[in-house]
Protein backbone atom coordinates (compact mmCIF):
# COMPACT_ATOMS: atom_id res chain seq x y z
CA UNK A 1 0.00 0.00 0.00
CA UNK A 2 2.87 2.39 0.78
CA UNK A 3 4.27 1.68 -2.68
CA UNK A 4 0.99 2.72 -4.27
CA UNK A 5 0.84 5.90 -2.16
CA UNK A 6 4.39 6.74 -3.23
CA UNK A 7 3.42 6.29 -6.88
CA UNK A 8 0.60 8.78 -6.42
CA UNK A 9 2.92 11.39 -4.90
CA UNK A 10 5.53 10.84 -7.61
CA UNK A 11 2.89 11.23 -10.32
CA UNK A 12 1.60 14.50 -8.85
CA UNK A 13 5.12 15.96 -8.69
CA UNK A 14 6.10 14.76 -12.17
CA UNK A 15 2.90 16.31 -13.54
CA UNK A 16 4.32 19.65 -12.38
CA UNK A 17 7.63 19.17 -14.15
CA UNK A 18 9.70 17.41 -11.52
CA UNK A 19 11.88 14.46 -12.55
CA UNK A 20 13.07 11.43 -10.61
CA UNK A 21 16.79 11.41 -9.79
CA UNK A 22 18.92 8.48 -8.71
CA UNK A 23 20.93 10.33 -6.05
CA UNK A 24 19.65 12.31 -3.07
CA UNK A 25 22.50 14.78 -3.59
CA UNK A 26 20.91 15.77 -6.92
CA UNK A 27 17.38 16.23 -5.57
CA UNK A 28 15.43 19.39 -4.85
CA UNK A 29 12.80 17.41 -2.92
CA UNK A 30 13.49 14.40 -0.66
CA UNK A 31 10.42 12.67 0.80
CA UNK A 32 10.37 9.53 2.94
CA UNK A 33 7.08 7.63 2.84
CA UNK A 34 6.99 5.79 6.15
CA UNK A 35 5.51 2.66 7.71
CA UNK A 36 4.68 2.17 11.39
CA UNK A 37 3.71 -1.49 11.49
CA UNK A 38 6.96 -2.31 13.33
CA UNK A 39 9.32 -0.19 15.40
CA UNK A 40 12.24 -1.11 13.14
CA UNK A 41 10.55 0.71 10.25
CA UNK A 42 10.22 3.86 12.37
CA UNK A 43 13.85 3.73 13.45
CA UNK A 44 15.05 3.16 9.90
CA UNK A 45 13.14 6.20 8.64
CA UNK A 46 14.35 8.40 11.49
CA UNK A 47 17.93 7.25 10.96
CA UNK A 48 17.74 7.92 7.24
CA UNK A 49 16.37 11.42 7.74
CA UNK A 50 19.04 12.10 10.35
CA UNK A 51 21.74 11.17 7.84
CA UNK A 52 20.25 13.67 5.40
CA UNK A 53 21.00 16.51 7.82
CA UNK A 54 24.42 17.06 6.26
CA UNK A 55 22.87 17.38 2.80
CA UNK A 56 20.43 19.94 4.22
CA UNK A 57 23.34 22.10 5.37
CA UNK A 58 25.02 21.86 1.98
CA UNK A 59 21.81 22.49 0.02
CA UNK A 60 19.46 24.62 2.16
CA UNK A 61 16.96 25.06 -0.69
CA UNK A 62 16.04 21.34 -0.66
CA UNK A 63 12.65 20.34 0.79
CA UNK A 64 12.80 17.39 3.21
CA UNK A 65 9.65 15.63 4.37
CA UNK A 66 8.05 12.66 6.09
CA UNK A 67 4.91 11.13 4.61
CA UNK A 68 2.62 8.28 5.60
CA UNK A 69 1.97 6.30 8.73
CA UNK A 70 4.79 7.48 10.99
CA UNK A 71 4.05 11.05 9.96
CA UNK A 72 0.40 10.49 10.87
CA UNK A 73 1.26 8.97 14.24
CA UNK A 74 3.92 11.47 15.34
CA UNK A 75 2.95 14.66 13.56
CA UNK A 76 4.80 17.80 14.57
CA UNK A 77 7.05 16.04 17.06
CA UNK A 78 9.11 14.87 14.07
CA UNK A 79 10.30 18.46 13.64
CA UNK A 80 11.86 18.65 17.10
CA UNK A 81 14.91 16.45 16.68
CA UNK A 82 15.31 16.96 12.94
CA UNK A 83 15.49 20.71 12.27
CA UNK A 84 15.94 20.26 8.53
CA UNK A 85 12.53 18.59 8.11
CA UNK A 86 10.12 20.95 6.36
CA UNK A 87 7.08 18.78 5.70
CA UNK A 88 5.05 16.20 7.64
CA UNK A 89 2.03 14.81 5.77
CA UNK A 90 -0.32 12.10 7.02
CA UNK A 91 -2.07 9.24 5.27
CA UNK A 92 -5.14 11.17 4.11
CA UNK A 93 -3.19 13.98 2.48
CA UNK A 94 -0.96 12.43 -0.17
CA UNK A 95 -2.81 14.41 -2.85
CA UNK A 96 -1.80 17.64 -1.09
CA UNK A 97 1.95 16.95 -1.14
CA UNK A 98 2.72 18.64 -4.47
CA UNK A 99 0.94 21.84 -3.36
CA UNK A 100 2.83 21.86 -0.07
CA UNK A 101 6.17 21.25 -1.79
CA UNK A 102 5.60 24.18 -4.16
CA UNK A 103 4.62 26.41 -1.24
CA UNK A 104 7.78 25.49 0.67
CA UNK A 105 10.01 25.99 -2.36
CA UNK A 106 8.52 29.44 -2.94
CA UNK A 107 9.13 30.40 0.70
CA UNK A 108 12.69 29.11 0.55
CA UNK A 109 13.38 31.12 -2.60
CA UNK A 110 12.01 34.22 -0.90
CA UNK A 111 14.14 33.52 2.17
CA UNK A 112 17.23 32.97 0.02
CA UNK A 113 16.65 36.26 -1.79
CA UNK A 114 16.30 38.16 1.49
CA UNK A 115 19.31 36.41 2.96
CA UNK A 116 21.42 37.25 -0.09
CA UNK A 117 20.78 40.95 0.49
CA UNK A 118 22.19 40.74 4.00
CA UNK A 119 25.85 41.14 4.80
CA UNK A 120 28.00 38.80 2.74
CA UNK A 121 30.10 38.17 5.84
CA UNK A 122 29.92 34.87 7.67
CA UNK A 123 28.33 33.08 4.70
CA UNK A 124 29.26 29.64 6.02
CA UNK A 125 27.53 30.32 9.34
CA UNK A 126 24.41 31.44 7.47
CA UNK A 127 24.41 28.20 5.44
CA UNK A 128 24.79 26.07 8.55
CA UNK A 129 22.00 27.86 10.36
CA UNK A 130 19.90 27.33 7.24
CA UNK A 131 16.46 28.60 8.18
CA UNK A 132 16.68 28.62 11.96
CA UNK A 133 16.09 32.37 12.08
CA UNK A 134 12.93 32.05 9.99
CA UNK A 135 11.81 28.45 9.82
CA UNK A 136 9.11 27.32 7.44
CA UNK A 137 7.37 24.00 7.96
CA UNK A 138 4.04 22.40 7.12
CA UNK A 139 2.38 19.68 9.18
CA UNK A 140 -0.91 18.21 7.96
CA UNK A 141 -2.23 15.05 9.59
CA UNK A 142 -5.90 16.02 9.62
CA UNK A 143 -8.65 13.75 8.35
CA UNK A 144 -10.12 14.56 4.96
CA UNK A 145 -13.47 13.40 3.64
CA UNK A 146 -13.15 11.55 0.35
CA UNK A 147 -9.42 10.88 0.68
CA UNK A 148 -10.00 7.26 -0.35
CA UNK A 149 -10.67 8.47 -3.89
CA UNK A 150 -7.52 10.57 -4.24
CA UNK A 151 -5.09 7.67 -4.83
CA UNK A 152 -6.01 7.12 -8.45
CA UNK A 153 -3.25 8.38 -10.77
CA UNK A 154 -0.21 6.38 -11.86
CA UNK A 155 3.00 7.10 -13.74
CA UNK A 156 3.64 3.90 -15.68
CA UNK A 157 7.04 2.85 -16.96
CA UNK A 158 7.48 1.50 -20.52
CA UNK A 159 6.08 -2.04 -20.89
CA UNK A 160 4.86 -2.06 -17.27
CA UNK A 161 2.87 -5.26 -16.80
CA UNK A 162 1.48 -4.89 -13.28
CA UNK A 163 -0.18 -2.15 -11.26
CA UNK A 164 -1.74 -1.63 -7.85
CA UNK A 165 -5.19 -0.09 -7.47
CA UNK A 166 -6.23 1.26 -4.08
CA UNK A 167 -9.89 0.42 -3.44
CA UNK A 168 -10.27 1.61 0.15
CA UNK A 169 -8.51 3.21 3.09
CA UNK A 170 -8.58 2.55 6.79
CA UNK A 171 -9.42 -0.33 9.10
CA UNK A 172 -12.07 -0.94 11.77
CA UNK A 173 -10.76 -4.24 13.16
CA UNK A 174 -8.53 -2.89 15.96
CA UNK A 175 -6.22 -5.87 16.38
CA UNK A 176 -4.46 -5.24 19.67
CA UNK A 177 -0.96 -5.29 18.14
CA UNK A 178 -1.73 -2.94 15.24
CA UNK A 179 -1.38 0.82 14.90
CA UNK A 180 -3.05 0.98 11.47
CA UNK A 181 -6.52 2.12 12.65
CA UNK A 182 -4.77 5.10 14.25
CA UNK A 183 -2.63 5.94 11.24
CA UNK A 184 -5.05 5.09 8.43
CA UNK A 185 -8.38 5.94 10.05
CA UNK A 186 -11.74 4.21 9.69
CA UNK A 187 -12.76 2.17 6.64
CA UNK A 188 -13.71 4.24 3.58
CA UNK A 189 -14.27 2.73 0.15
CA UNK A 190 -14.24 4.01 -3.42
CA UNK A 191 -17.14 3.22 -5.74
CA UNK A 192 -17.08 0.17 -8.02
CA UNK A 193 -17.49 2.35 -11.11
CA UNK A 194 -14.56 4.56 -10.12
CA UNK A 195 -12.28 1.56 -9.51
CA UNK A 196 -13.31 -0.21 -12.71
CA UNK A 197 -12.66 2.98 -14.66
CA UNK A 198 -9.12 3.19 -13.27
CA UNK A 199 -8.52 -0.46 -14.17
CA UNK A 200 -9.76 0.09 -17.72
CA UNK A 201 -7.39 3.03 -18.10
CA UNK A 202 -4.42 1.01 -16.84
CA UNK A 203 -5.21 -1.93 -19.12
CA UNK A 204 -5.55 0.42 -22.10
CA UNK A 205 -1.99 1.57 -21.31
CA UNK A 206 -0.63 -1.97 -21.42
CA UNK A 207 -1.06 -3.28 -17.87
CA UNK A 208 -2.03 -6.96 -17.79
CA UNK A 209 -2.24 -7.67 -14.05
CA UNK A 210 -4.03 -5.62 -11.40
CA UNK A 211 -3.71 -6.01 -7.63
CA UNK A 212 -6.58 -4.53 -5.61
CA UNK A 213 -5.31 -3.00 -2.37
CA UNK A 214 -6.98 -2.46 0.98
CA UNK A 215 -6.04 -2.72 4.64
CA UNK A 216 -8.64 -5.50 4.85
CA UNK A 217 -9.46 -5.75 1.21
CA UNK A 218 -12.30 -8.29 1.40
CA UNK A 219 -14.28 -6.03 3.75
CA UNK A 220 -14.46 -3.43 0.98
CA UNK A 221 -17.65 -1.39 0.88
CA UNK A 222 -19.40 -3.12 3.75
CA UNK A 223 -20.53 0.19 5.27
CA UNK A 224 -21.28 2.01 2.00
CA UNK A 225 -22.79 -0.48 -0.44
CA UNK A 226 -25.50 -3.15 -0.17
CA UNK A 227 -25.26 -6.82 -1.00
CA UNK A 228 -26.70 -7.79 -4.40
CA UNK A 229 -27.93 -11.34 -4.98
CA UNK A 230 -26.27 -12.33 -1.69
CA UNK A 231 -22.92 -11.09 -2.99
CA UNK A 232 -20.80 -8.79 -0.86
CA UNK A 233 -19.61 -5.46 -2.31
CA UNK A 234 -16.11 -6.96 -2.64
CA UNK A 235 -17.33 -9.85 -4.78
CA UNK A 236 -19.37 -7.41 -6.86
CA UNK A 237 -16.16 -5.43 -7.37
CA UNK A 238 -14.20 -8.53 -8.37
CA UNK A 239 -16.84 -9.40 -10.96
CA UNK A 240 -16.86 -5.86 -12.36
CA UNK A 241 -13.08 -5.70 -12.69
CA UNK A 242 -12.98 -9.23 -14.08
CA UNK A 243 -15.09 -8.03 -17.02
CA UNK A 244 -12.49 -5.46 -18.12
CA UNK A 245 -11.43 -6.48 -21.61
CA UNK A 246 -7.70 -7.08 -21.93
CA UNK A 247 -7.10 -7.74 -18.24
CA UNK A 248 -5.24 -11.03 -17.85
CA UNK A 249 -4.79 -11.43 -14.10
CA UNK A 250 -6.44 -10.07 -10.99
CA UNK A 251 -5.05 -10.23 -7.45
CA UNK A 252 -6.10 -8.75 -4.11
CA UNK A 253 -4.32 -8.13 -0.81
CA UNK A 254 -4.59 -8.37 2.12
CA UNK A 255 -7.81 -10.08 3.21
CA UNK A 256 -8.95 -11.03 6.71
CA UNK A 257 -10.22 -14.56 7.43
CA UNK A 258 -13.52 -13.22 8.77
CA UNK A 259 -14.24 -11.62 5.39
CA UNK A 260 -13.98 -14.92 3.53
CA UNK A 261 -17.64 -15.85 3.04
CA UNK A 262 -19.00 -18.42 0.63
CA UNK A 263 -19.58 -15.82 -2.08
CA UNK A 264 -15.85 -15.01 -2.17
CA UNK A 265 -14.84 -18.67 -2.21
CA UNK A 266 -17.30 -19.20 -5.05
CA UNK A 267 -15.76 -16.26 -6.92
CA UNK A 268 -12.33 -17.87 -6.59
CA UNK A 269 -13.73 -21.00 -8.19
CA UNK A 270 -15.49 -19.36 -11.15
CA UNK A 271 -13.54 -16.18 -12.01
CA UNK A 272 -10.64 -17.48 -14.13
CA UNK A 273 -8.72 -14.20 -14.19
CA UNK A 274 -8.34 -14.34 -10.41
CA UNK A 275 -4.77 -15.40 -9.69
CA UNK A 276 -4.25 -18.79 -8.07
CA UNK A 277 -2.90 -17.23 -4.90
CA UNK A 278 -4.43 -16.06 -1.64
CA UNK A 279 -2.44 -14.28 1.04
CA UNK A 280 -4.35 -15.09 4.22
CA UNK A 281 -2.84 -13.72 7.46
CA UNK A 282 -2.88 -16.25 10.30
CA UNK A 283 -0.87 -14.37 12.97
CA UNK A 284 -0.99 -17.26 15.48
CA UNK A 285 -2.03 -20.89 15.75
CA UNK A 286 -3.00 -20.52 19.41
CA UNK A 287 -6.63 -19.67 20.17
CA UNK A 288 -5.56 -17.98 23.38
CA UNK A 289 -3.22 -15.67 21.49
CA UNK A 290 -5.70 -15.08 18.66
CA UNK A 291 -8.24 -13.94 21.26
CA UNK A 292 -5.67 -11.65 22.89
CA UNK A 293 -4.91 -10.24 19.44
CA UNK A 294 -8.63 -9.62 18.83
CA UNK A 295 -8.53 -11.59 15.59
CA UNK A 296 -12.15 -12.88 15.81
CA UNK A 297 -11.50 -16.43 14.54
CA UNK A 298 -10.03 -19.65 15.90
CA UNK A 299 -7.23 -21.82 14.58
CA UNK A 300 -9.80 -24.49 13.72
CA UNK A 301 -11.87 -22.06 11.65
CA UNK A 302 -8.74 -20.88 9.87
CA UNK A 303 -7.75 -24.43 8.91
CA UNK A 304 -11.27 -25.13 7.67
CA UNK A 305 -11.17 -21.95 5.57
CA UNK A 306 -7.87 -22.97 3.97
CA UNK A 307 -9.37 -26.35 3.08
CA UNK A 308 -12.41 -24.73 1.47
CA UNK A 309 -10.24 -22.35 -0.56
CA UNK A 310 -8.10 -25.23 -1.77
CA UNK A 311 -11.17 -27.20 -2.77
CA UNK A 312 -12.43 -24.22 -4.76
CA UNK A 313 -9.34 -23.95 -6.97
CA UNK A 314 -6.81 -26.61 -7.93
CA UNK A 315 -3.18 -25.76 -7.18
CA UNK A 316 -4.02 -22.48 -5.42
CA UNK A 317 -1.12 -21.13 -3.37
CA UNK A 318 -1.72 -20.00 0.21
CA UNK A 319 0.71 -17.61 1.89
CA UNK A 320 0.41 -15.96 5.28
CA UNK A 321 1.68 -13.60 8.00
CA UNK A 322 2.66 -14.87 11.45
CA UNK A 323 3.71 -13.03 14.60
CA UNK A 324 5.86 -14.82 17.18
CA UNK A 325 6.51 -13.58 20.70
CA UNK A 326 3.18 -11.82 21.21
CA UNK A 327 2.66 -10.92 24.89
CA UNK A 328 1.71 -14.01 26.89
CA UNK A 329 2.80 -16.50 24.21
CA UNK A 330 4.01 -19.59 26.06
CA UNK A 331 6.06 -22.43 24.60
CA UNK A 332 2.83 -24.38 24.21
CA UNK A 333 1.20 -21.47 22.36
CA UNK A 334 4.18 -21.30 20.03
CA UNK A 335 4.10 -25.05 19.49
CA UNK A 336 0.45 -24.78 18.44
CA UNK A 337 1.47 -22.20 15.83
CA UNK A 338 4.32 -24.38 14.64
CA UNK A 339 2.09 -27.45 14.39
CA UNK A 340 -0.52 -25.54 12.40
CA UNK A 341 2.11 -24.21 9.99
CA UNK A 342 3.39 -27.73 9.48
CA UNK A 343 -0.15 -29.01 8.90
CA UNK A 344 -1.15 -26.37 6.35
CA UNK A 345 2.13 -26.35 4.39
CA UNK A 346 2.02 -22.73 3.27
CA UNK A 347 3.67 -21.85 -0.03
CA UNK A 348 5.41 -19.05 1.84
CA UNK A 349 5.02 -17.00 5.00
CA UNK A 350 6.21 -13.71 6.41
CA UNK A 351 7.28 -14.38 9.99
CA UNK A 352 7.69 -11.39 12.31
CA UNK A 353 8.86 -10.93 15.88
CA UNK A 354 6.22 -9.02 17.84
CA UNK A 355 7.10 -5.32 17.94
CA UNK A 356 5.27 -3.14 20.50
CA UNK A 357 3.62 -0.10 18.93
CA UNK A 358 2.86 2.82 21.15
CA UNK A 359 -0.73 3.45 22.18
CA UNK A 360 -1.83 -0.08 21.22
CA UNK A 361 -3.41 -2.44 23.78
CA UNK A 362 -0.74 -5.11 23.28
CA UNK A 363 2.05 -2.68 24.12
CA UNK A 364 0.49 -2.18 27.57
CA UNK A 365 0.22 -5.90 28.32
CA UNK A 366 2.42 -6.93 31.23
CA UNK A 367 3.54 -10.35 30.03
CA UNK A 368 5.95 -9.20 27.31
CA UNK A 369 8.29 -11.82 25.85
CA UNK A 370 12.08 -11.57 26.03
CA UNK A 371 13.77 -10.61 22.76
CA UNK A 372 15.99 -13.70 22.73
CA UNK A 373 12.88 -15.90 22.98
CA UNK A 374 11.22 -14.04 20.11
CA UNK A 375 14.34 -14.46 17.99
CA UNK A 376 14.62 -18.18 18.71
CA UNK A 377 10.98 -18.77 17.75
CA UNK A 378 11.35 -16.59 14.68
CA UNK A 379 14.35 -18.54 13.41
CA UNK A 380 12.76 -21.90 14.18
CA UNK A 381 9.56 -21.05 12.33
CA UNK A 382 11.48 -19.58 9.39
CA UNK A 383 13.32 -22.87 8.96
CA UNK A 384 10.00 -24.71 8.84
CA UNK A 385 8.48 -22.23 6.38
CA UNK A 386 11.55 -22.26 4.15
CA UNK A 387 11.34 -26.03 3.85
CA UNK A 388 7.67 -25.81 2.87
CA UNK A 389 8.50 -23.10 0.32
CA UNK A 390 11.29 -25.22 -1.13
CA UNK A 391 8.96 -28.19 -1.60
CA UNK A 392 6.33 -25.99 -3.26
CA UNK A 393 8.93 -24.81 -5.76
CA UNK A 394 10.34 -28.24 -6.45
CA UNK A 395 6.89 -29.53 -7.38
CA UNK A 396 7.04 -27.26 -10.44
CA UNK A 397 10.38 -28.55 -11.73
CA UNK A 398 9.77 -30.19 -15.11
CA UNK A 399 6.46 -28.34 -15.53
CA UNK A 400 5.46 -25.69 -18.05
CA UNK A 401 3.97 -22.61 -16.38
CA UNK A 402 2.61 -19.30 -17.58
CA UNK A 403 4.68 -16.37 -16.34
CA UNK A 404 3.98 -12.65 -16.56
CA UNK A 405 7.35 -11.06 -17.30
CA UNK A 406 7.83 -7.95 -15.16
CA UNK A 407 11.33 -6.94 -16.26
CA UNK A 408 15.02 -7.49 -15.48
CA UNK A 409 15.86 -9.29 -12.25
CA UNK A 410 17.03 -6.89 -9.53
CA UNK A 411 19.74 -9.33 -8.44
CA UNK A 412 20.86 -10.36 -11.94
CA UNK A 413 19.99 -7.87 -14.70
CA UNK A 414 21.15 -10.38 -17.31
CA UNK A 415 18.00 -12.36 -16.61
CA UNK A 416 14.31 -11.50 -16.68
CA UNK A 417 11.94 -11.96 -13.76
CA UNK A 418 8.27 -12.81 -13.79
CA UNK A 419 5.59 -14.40 -11.64
CA UNK A 420 3.32 -17.36 -12.06
CA UNK A 421 -0.36 -17.13 -11.26
CA UNK A 422 0.55 -18.75 -7.92
CA UNK A 423 2.96 -15.85 -7.26
CA UNK A 424 6.14 -17.89 -7.68
CA UNK A 425 9.11 -15.85 -8.91
CA UNK A 426 10.65 -17.24 -12.11
CA UNK A 427 14.00 -16.20 -13.65
CA UNK A 428 14.87 -16.83 -17.29
CA UNK A 429 17.16 -15.68 -20.09
CA UNK A 430 16.82 -12.02 -20.98
CA UNK A 431 14.90 -11.04 -24.10
CA UNK A 432 13.52 -7.52 -23.79
CA UNK A 433 10.70 -8.31 -26.21
CA UNK A 434 9.19 -10.51 -23.49
CA UNK A 435 8.90 -7.72 -20.90
CA UNK A 436 5.24 -7.07 -20.15
CA UNK A 437 4.11 -10.29 -21.82
CA UNK A 438 2.72 -13.62 -20.68
CA UNK A 439 5.28 -16.30 -21.48
CA UNK A 440 5.29 -20.10 -21.21
CA UNK A 441 8.33 -21.18 -19.20
CA UNK A 442 9.65 -24.70 -18.68
CA UNK A 443 10.87 -24.88 -15.08
CA UNK A 444 14.29 -26.50 -14.85
CA UNK A 445 15.24 -26.02 -11.23
CA UNK A 446 14.11 -24.55 -7.93
CA UNK A 447 16.55 -22.24 -6.20
CA UNK A 448 15.39 -21.22 -2.73
CA UNK A 449 12.55 -18.73 -3.16
CA UNK A 450 12.77 -18.55 -6.95
CA UNK A 451 12.52 -20.85 -9.96
CA UNK A 452 14.70 -20.95 -13.06
CA UNK A 453 13.54 -21.94 -16.51
CA UNK A 454 13.57 -21.47 -20.26
CA UNK A 455 10.96 -19.85 -22.52
CA UNK A 456 9.11 -22.42 -24.60
CA UNK A 457 9.34 -22.07 -28.37
CA UNK A 458 6.30 -23.09 -30.41
CA UNK A 459 5.02 -22.53 -33.92
CA UNK A 460 3.22 -19.46 -32.64
CA UNK A 461 6.33 -18.06 -30.96
CA UNK A 462 7.09 -17.95 -27.25
CA UNK A 463 4.21 -15.84 -25.96
CA UNK A 464 1.54 -17.64 -23.97
CA UNK A 465 -2.05 -17.83 -25.11
CA UNK A 466 -3.00 -21.13 -23.51
CA UNK A 467 -4.38 -19.81 -20.23
CA UNK A 468 -2.64 -22.52 -18.26
CA UNK A 469 -2.69 -22.54 -14.48
CA UNK A 470 0.14 -21.69 -12.13
CA UNK A 471 0.59 -25.32 -11.13
CA UNK A 472 1.96 -26.11 -14.56
CA UNK A 473 1.59 -28.81 -17.18
CA UNK A 474 3.84 -31.84 -17.46
CA UNK A 475 6.71 -32.17 -19.89
CA UNK A 476 5.95 -34.77 -22.55
CA UNK A 477 8.04 -37.93 -22.95
CA UNK A 478 9.73 -36.43 -26.00
CA UNK A 479 11.22 -33.70 -23.86
CA UNK A 480 9.00 -30.89 -25.13
CA UNK A 481 6.68 -29.19 -22.64
CA UNK A 482 3.05 -30.16 -23.19
CA UNK A 483 2.08 -26.51 -23.32
CA UNK A 484 -0.70 -26.82 -25.86
CA UNK A 485 -2.91 -28.56 -23.33
CA UNK A 486 -3.66 -25.92 -20.73
CA UNK A 487 -6.01 -26.28 -17.83
CA UNK A 488 -8.85 -24.62 -19.68
CA UNK A 489 -8.82 -21.34 -17.76
CA UNK A 490 -9.05 -18.07 -19.61
CA UNK A 491 -5.95 -15.91 -19.57
Identify what each model region corresponds to:
Residues 110-137, 227, 457-487:
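Intrinsically disordered, low-complexity terminal tails and inter-domain linkers enriched
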Residues 235, 243-244, 249, 261-320:
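Radical SAM/AdoMet-radical enzyme domain recognition
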Residues 364-473, 478-491:
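Terminal RNA-binding accessory module
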Amino acid sequence: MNERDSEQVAHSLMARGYERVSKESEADVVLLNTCSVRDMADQKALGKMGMLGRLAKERPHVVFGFLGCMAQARGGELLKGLPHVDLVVGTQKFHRVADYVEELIAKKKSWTSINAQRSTLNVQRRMENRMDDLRFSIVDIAEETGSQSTIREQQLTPRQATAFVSIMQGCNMHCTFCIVPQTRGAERSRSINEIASEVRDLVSRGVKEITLLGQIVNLYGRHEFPKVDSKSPFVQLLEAVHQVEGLKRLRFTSPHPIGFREDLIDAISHLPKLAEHVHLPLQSGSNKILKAMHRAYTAEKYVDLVRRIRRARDCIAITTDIIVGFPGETEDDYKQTRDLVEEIQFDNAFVFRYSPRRDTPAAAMTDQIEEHTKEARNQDLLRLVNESTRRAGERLVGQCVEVLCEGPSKTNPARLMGRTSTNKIVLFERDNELIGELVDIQIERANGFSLCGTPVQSSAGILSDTGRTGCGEPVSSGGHPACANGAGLEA
